[in-house]
C-alpha cells in the first residue's frame, strides 16, 4: 500500500472541516490523542515515548523506510514536550508556506510543535482564556507545515477542557483515536472514568489504556516495589471494556533522559534575538490569526524565500536524547506497547466504527 493511498485525502468526508486544516492534514495517516484524567500521571512522557518509538520503527505504508511522526503539544499552559525531547532552546521558523516545525534529527522523521517554542522565556506563563486557546490550536493544525506523516501524536492537557473540545471539533472528519494513561492510584483511576465518559459522549474511539508508574524497579537489586498499588489500570480496562496495552514501571534512567535534557539548543545569539521578536508577533497575532501566505507574514523574515534553509535539521542534543532513550530499560517495554498501538491504529483506519475499538456504553 502506498503512502498516498493510506493517507487521509481531501474529499467529501471532510465536508464542513476548515479548508486550511484539511490541506495541512491531508497527508497524515493516523492521528492519536493521548489523554489522562488527572495531571501527574506521566501523560506527556508517554506521548514523547510514543513519538520516539514510532519514529524508530518502519512506516506502516512502506516498510522500506522509517515512519515519519509529528507530535503536537496542546497543553498550552504547561508545555513540556520541548524539554523532554531536548529542544528547549529551539524555535519555530516562519516560511512562505506556513510555520516550520522543529525537527529532532537531520532526517526529519520527528516533527515537533508546541507553544513552548513561542515563549520569550521557559518561565513565561500562558494566561489565556478559551477563545485564544482555541485560536492557537487551530493555527497549530492549519498553519504548520506538517507534510507527509504516518502518525500525528497530540499531547493534551489533563482532564477534559476547552482544548479537548476544540481539537475534536477541528479533527472530527479525520477520525482520530485516543490512548488513555493512568497510574495504579485510586484517584487516578477515578479521574480516568471521567475522561472515558468524555470519549463516549464525543464518540472518540479509545485504542487502549496504559498503566504508567506501575512499580519501581530498584537499580541495585532489581526488586520491584508497587509504590501505588498494582493492577488497578488492568482492572479498570477490563471493567470498562478497554484494551489494556501494558504497564510501564518507574525507570530512573528514563527520568534522566526526559528530565535532564538540556534547555540550550545552541542557537546563535543574533538568531535568538530575531526569533524573540518573531515569537512576540506570532503570539500577538493569535487574536487575529496569522496568514502565513501573506506578504506581511513573509516579510517577518529577512529572505523569506530562503526560509527552507533555516529549517532546523535536528540538534546534537536531541539526537543524543533519542539514542539515550533507545538505551533505556523502558524502551523495549514501551516498544511492545507501541506495536499494539500501531496495529490498533491501522485497524481503526480500516474500520473506524469497529466496536472492538470504541468504548462500549
From Swiss-Prot:
Amino acids binding ATP: 37-44
Keyword terms of this UniProt record: 4Fe-4S, ATP-binding, Cytoplasm, Iron, Iron-sulfur, Metal-binding, Nucleotide-binding
Region spans: Disordered: 293-314
Protein origin, superkingdom: Eukaryota
Gene3D superfamilies given in the database record: P-loop containing nucleotide triphosphate hydrolases
InterPro entries membership: Mrp-like_CS, Mrp/NBP35_ATP-bd, NUBP2/Cfd1_eukaryotes, P-loop_NTPase, YlxH/NBP35
Cofactor note: Binds 4 [4Fe-4S] clusters per heterotetramer. Contains two stable clusters in the N-termini of NBP35 and two labile, bridging clusters between subunits of the NBP35-CFD1 heterotetramer.
Cofactor(s) needed: [4Fe-4S] cluster
Places the protein is found: Cytoplasm
GO molecular function, one term: metal ion binding
A GO biological process held by the record: tRNA wobble uridine modification
Primary localisation category: cytoplasm
One Gene Ontology term, aspect cellular component: cytosolic [4Fe-4S] assembly scaffold complex
Keyword presence, Cytoplasm: yes
Coiled-coil regions listed in the entry: none
Pfam families referenced in this protein's UniProt entry, alphabetically: ParA (PF10609)
Positions annotated to bind [4Fe-4S] cluster: 218, 221
Assembly description: Heterotetramer of 2 NBP35 and 2 CFD1 chains.
HAMAP family in UniProt: Mrp_NBP35 (MF_02040), NUBP2 (MF_03039)
Protein task: Component of the cytosolic iron-sulfur (Fe/S) protein assembly (CIA) machinery. Required for maturation of extramitochondrial Fe-S proteins. The NBP35-CFD1 heterotetramer forms a Fe-S scaffold complex, mediating the de novo assembly of an Fe-S cluster and its transfer to target apoproteins.
Family, similarity comment: Belongs to the Mrp/NBP35 ATP-binding proteins family. NUBP2/CFD1 subfamily.
Protein name, UniProt field: Cytosolic Fe-S cluster assembly factor CFD1
Organism placement in taxonomy: Eukaryota, Fungi, Dikarya, Basidiomycota, Ustilaginomycotina
Gene name linked to the record: CFD1
Amino acid at each position: 500500500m502506498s503512502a498516498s493511498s493510506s493517507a487521509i485525502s481531501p474529499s467529501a468526508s471532510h465536508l464542513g472541516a476548515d479548508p486550511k486544516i484539511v490541506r495541512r492534514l491531508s497527508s497524515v495517516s493516523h492521528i492519536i490523542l493521548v489523554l489522562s484524567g488527572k495531571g501527574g500521571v506521566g501523560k506527556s512522557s508517554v506521548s514523547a515515548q510514543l513519538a520516539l518509538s514510532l519514529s524508530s520503527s518502519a512506516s506502516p505504508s512502506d516498510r522500506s523506510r522509517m515512519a515519519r511522526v509529528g507530535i503536537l503539544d496542546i497543553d498550552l499552559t504547561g508545555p513540556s514536550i520541548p524539554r523532554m525531547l531536548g529542544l528547549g532552546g529551539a524555535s519555530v521558523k516562519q516560511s512562505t508556506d506556513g510555520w516550520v516545525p522543529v525537527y529532532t534529527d537531520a532526517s526529519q522523521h520527528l516533527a515537533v510543535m508546541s507553544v513552548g517554542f513561542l515563549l520569550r522565556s521557559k518561565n513565561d506563563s500562558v494566561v489565556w482564556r478559551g477563545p485564544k486557546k482555541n485560536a492557537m490550536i487551530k493555527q497549530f493544525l492549519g498553519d504548520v507545515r506538517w507534510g507527509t506523516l504516518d502518525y500525528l501524536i497530540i499531547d493534551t492537557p489533563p482532564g477534559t477542557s476547552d482544548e479537548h473540545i476544540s481539537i475534536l471539533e477541528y479533527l472530527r472528519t479525520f477520525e482520530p483515536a485516543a490512548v488513555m494513561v493512568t497510574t495504579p492510584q485510586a484517584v487516578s483511576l477515578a479521574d480516568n472514568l471521567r475522561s472515558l465518559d468524555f470519549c463516549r459522549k464525543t464518540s472518540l474511539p479509545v485504542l487502549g489504556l496504559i498503566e504508567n508508574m506501575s512499580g519501581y524497579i530498584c537499580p541495585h537489586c532489581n526488586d520491584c516495589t508497587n509504590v501505588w498499588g498494582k493492577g488497578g489500570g488492568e482492572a479498570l480496562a477490563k471493567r470498562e471494556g478497554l484494551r489494556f496495552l501494558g504497564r510501564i514501571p518507574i525507570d530512573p534512567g528514563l527520568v534522566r533522559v526526559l528530565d535532564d535534557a538540556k534547555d540550550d539548543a545552541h542557537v546563535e545569539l543574533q538568531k535568538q534575538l530575531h526569533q524573540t521578536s518573531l515569537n512576540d508577533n506570532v503570539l500577538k497575532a493569535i487574536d487575529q490569526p496569522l496568514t502565513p501566505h501573506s506578504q506581511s507574514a513573509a516579510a517577518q523574515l529577512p529572505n523569506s524565500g530562503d526560509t527552507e534553509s533555516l529549517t532546523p535539521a535536528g540538534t546534537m542534543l536531541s539526537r543524543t536524547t533519542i539514542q539515550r532513550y533507545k538505551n533505556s530499560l523502558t524502551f523495549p517495554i514501551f516498544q511492545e506497547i507501541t506495536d499494539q498501538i500501531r496495529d490498533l491504529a491501522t485497524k481503526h483506519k480500516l474500520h473506524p466504527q469497529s466496536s472492538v475499538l470504541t468504548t462500549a456504553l
